[in-house]
Amino acid sequence: MIREINVSEITAAIKEMCIQANHFLSPDMDKALKAATANEESPLGKKILNQLQENLKIAGEDMIPICQDTGMAVFFIEIGQDVHFTGGVLEDAINEGVRQGYTDGYLRKSVVKDPLIRENTKDNTPAVIHYSIVSGD
């Protein structure tokens, strides 16, 4: 049975992922940071870890990026061999989601078209995309 996914769903999900990833830590990373802070013996180290936690709190509450360098968008895509994308091209949908996420999330645009010319794309595309085809849908 073929499963159909409209690429507009991919664009919306990528947009939200870009914004969320730059404003919040995943629960496992948050837990690891809290554990590191609790276990840190150095007063300076503990102070720095507490500052990181305060930064995360502010980022989440005020919806500002955790770090001013919001990086490149890198995706590892597993596509079931029984999936068919409709409404456009998957790669275009991913890049449009990145474009919307970095624009609407007010994230720093730092990707260049050509590393020698250094011309900024002004929307952080293209994303780095790794594809794997897997069984199922």
Regions found by a protein language model. Name each.
Residues M1-D137:
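Non-transmembrane, aqueous-exposed alpha-helical and coiled segments at domain scale
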